[in-house]
Amino acid sequence: MLIADLPTYGYRRVHALLRRQAEREGHPAPNVKRVYRVMKIHGLLLQRHAGGGEERRHEGRVAVDVRKTRWCSDGLEIGCENGERVRVAFALDCCDREAMSYVATTAGITGEDVRDLMVAAVEHRFGRVNRLPSEIEWLTDNGSCYVARETRRFAADIGLVPRTTPLESPQSNGMAEAFVRTLKRDYVRVSPVPDAQAVLRQLPGWLAHYNEVHPHRSLGYRSPREFIQRSTHEGLSGN
């Protein structure tokens, strides 16, 4: 049932979910090699990606070691079976990978949408405040909705510091690009998307599952919320 519900998960992510279940129930965690063998026997391993052309890589490091110091944002388009399209913009924390906020529309993403996205992210992390207690970098590409003068001015007013990727290298915002691939692969492609309303209804559930369940290799195969909870607990305990 686990594999049937998550057909795009490889053996390491399946192992992470089984480990999480074992921890919750107080049982020993399964061995990752055993999970691999069982999935191989039953033909459940994912095929290796053959790869295409060489990808451009970000020369700097997008990820940070401290939460609430750098956020990144990007957008994606989801095509529906009836030809409608839903455009989504999102904000991630570059440490814990949580999808803090999103906006979605059947029109184009505007500067006003991005400003709403900023406010939602700030309120999610800090509550209703007029300005962040300390500045946070806001990493995006050079899309017009992000570089609009009013948007950049608004960002500065609330304590966000706009940072943009090189003009000819949108993939340098690698964390946001990875999130787009994850959302399309693990949620959109395995869900019914007959029309825009169906996508808009499912988006909150997809993002909740991503935040609560989806294991990240860079987080020790923990979900963003698991990572946040463990970080908070360790901070309170002084470890």
Tell what function each PLM region has.
Residues 1-70, 223-232:
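Basic, flexible linker segments flanking DNA-binding modules
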Residues 2, 72-124, 136-137, 165:
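A short, conserved beta-strand element enriched in hydrophobic/aromatic residues
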Residues 6-8, 24-26, 65, 80-81, ...:
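Conserved, non-catalytic sequence blocks in retroelement Pol enzymes and Pol-derived host proteins
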Residues 14, 35, 74, 91, ...:
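Mobile genetic element proteins and their domesticated derivatives, centered on retroelements
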Residues 49-53, 104, 138-142, 157-175, ...:
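RNase H-like polynucleotidyl transferase catalytic core
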Residues 129-147, 222-225:
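Acidic/histidine-rich, metal-coordinating catalytic segments
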Residues 134, 156-160, 182-239:
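C-terminal domain-tail junction helix/linker
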